[in-house]
C-alpha cells in the first residue's frame, strides 16, 4: 500500500473551484499590468498553474513591490510576518477604490 501525495494543491479542490459560467480564461487577465505600490487581491486562476501562489494566500490583499519577468513580487502579511510572493498577473486583481 502506497502513501497519498500531499502536494501543492492538496485539499484545495473547493478553494480552486470555478462556477460553470466563470469557466475559461479571459485573455485580458494575462495582459493586465500593475504599478509598484499598487494594492492587489490574490484571486487564483485554477486554469493556469504557472506563477500560482499557494492556496493559503487565496483572497489575501498585498502590495506590488516589484516585477520579475512577467510575474510580480507581492508583499502579503501572513500572521505577524510579511512574505514576498512571486505571482503572475492572471492570479491578481487590482483593488478598486
Curated annotation (Swiss-Prot):
A molecular function GO annotation: structural constituent of ribosome
SUPFAM superfamilies for the chain: Translation proteins SH3-like domain (SSF50104)
UniProt GO cellular component terms: ribonucleoprotein complex; ribosome
GO terms (BP aspect): translation
Signal peptide: none
Keywords associated with the record: Ribonucleoprotein, Ribosomal protein
Pfam families referenced in this protein's UniProt entry, alphabetically: Ribosomal_L21e (PF01157)
Keyword Ribonucleoprotein: yes
UniProt keyword annotation of Ribosomal protein present: yes
HAMAP family: Ribosomal_eL21 (MF_00369)
PANTHER family: 60S RIBOSOMAL PROTEIN L21
Family the entry assigns: Belongs to the eukaryotic ribosomal protein eL21 family.
Database matches in NCBIfam families: PRK04306.1
Designated name of the protein: Large ribosomal subunit protein eL21
Amino acid at each position: 500500500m502506497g502513501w497519498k501525495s500531499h502536494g501543492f494543491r492538496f485539499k484545495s479542490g473547493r478553494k480552486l473551484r470555478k462556477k460553470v459560467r466563470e469557466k475559461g480564461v479571459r485573455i485580458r487577465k494575462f495582459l493586465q499590468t500593475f504599478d509598484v505600490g499598487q494594492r492587489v487581491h490574490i484571486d487564483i486562476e485554477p486554469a493556469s498553474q504557472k506563477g500560482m501562489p499557494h492556496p493559503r494566500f487565496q483572497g489575501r490583499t498585498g502590495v506590488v513591490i516589484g516585477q520579475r519577468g512577467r510575474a510580480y513580487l507581492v508583499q502579503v502579511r501572513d500572521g505577524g510576518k510579511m512574505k514576498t510572493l512571486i505571482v503572475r498577473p492572471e492570479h491578481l486583481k487590482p483593488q478598486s477604490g
